[in-house]
Structure formats: structure tokens, C-alpha cells
Amino acid sequence: MIKKTSLLLALLMTTSIAFTSETPDGFLKDSVEEISSLVTKYKDRFETDEEFLRDKMNSSVMPKLDIKLMSKIILGKKIWTDMSESQKDDFVEAFQYRMTSTYMKSITAFDGEKVVFLPYEPGKRENIAYVKSKYLIPGGDIAVDYRLIKKSEEWKVYDIIFDGISLMKNYRADFREHVSHNGIESLITSLRE
């Protein structure tokens, strides 16, 4: 399941095209098409050149996620507001590093799997959307849903739900427990390892 989760997150995140007036489901469809062509073009190099892969992830993938919003959601209002600006910046950077490290290898596992997207559901606010999808992979389909926010005319993903399990909720439980026992500085250090 971890490998499938990593693959699906990598599929979602990879795109280098600027989407300014795209619908959220269109943004996700284009992202999957982009990963397919990116992997086709660079698969061998991705498997052997970790620095190149990390650079591609950081320049093309991570900008499509709202890492700062994800950080706030994961840590919660109390912890976030108690942190200094420097700690907030350090956490966001460390969390992005961890996300990149965790998911960059799974990009090479993409092998043209088919994805079906349902039309997006608007959120309570016009800049929020929810998109349901199904990844058709050998061994069984996986339901993957996305929560997106529109900022500066661009859609960004801030949560991914795999078979009903929120990525943010999983991180939230682990990270908050770590902070309660060891403090925020310890969590930041562990994310950088």
C-alpha cells in the first residue's frame, strides 16, 4: 500500500505547465498526462541520477502543492501560532524536503496506469474544490480523492485521500505526537534526515 500511495502522490504532483484558468479536474488530468511524458523521457535517468530527480521534483512537482497550507493543517492552529516565523519557515522547508525524499523514487514506477477523474465538486467557497478519481492498476483499482485550493489563479493540492484515508490526517497524528513529546525543533530536524 505504501508503494501504491507513493506512486499515486508522485503521479498527482508532476507537472510543469502553468494552469491559470483550468478547472481542478482538468489540472489533475493534465498532471497525469505530464507525468507519463516526463517518465517516458527521463525514466532511465530518474533511476540512476538522484540529484536530477530531486531537481525535477522541486522545480516541477512541489510548486503544485500548497506546502504552507499543508503544514498549517498538519500541525494545527495551536502549534502553528505558537511557532516563531523562523520555525514556520524551517518547518515548511523541512516538510517539503521530506515529501520530495519520500515520493521521488516512486515516479519511476509509473507505467501508464489509467486514471478516471469524475467532475469536480465545488467546495463551500469558490476557491475550494474536491475531485474524485480512480486509478486502474493491476491487482485492483484505488480510489484517490483530492482537495484543492485556488490561489493567485492557480489550483494547488492541499490534501490527498487514498481509499478514504487522508494523507494530512496521517501526518497530523504522527507530527503532533512528535511535537508533544519532543518539541517542534526535534520534528524539524527529523524531517530533514
Language-model region placement:
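Surface-exposed, charged secondary-structure patches
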Residues: S101-I142
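Boundary at the C-terminal end of the N-terminal hydrophobic targeting segment
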Residues: A18-E22
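Early exported N-terminus immediately downstream of N-terminal targeting peptides
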Residues: T23-Y103
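Sec-dependent N-terminal signal peptides
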Residues: S6-A10
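Positively charged n-region of N-terminal signal peptides that target proteins for export
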Residues: M1-T5
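Low-complexity, intrinsically disordered terminal/linker segments enriched in charged
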Residues: F162-E193
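Short beta-strand edge/turn micro-motifs at domain boundaries
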Residues: D141-K169
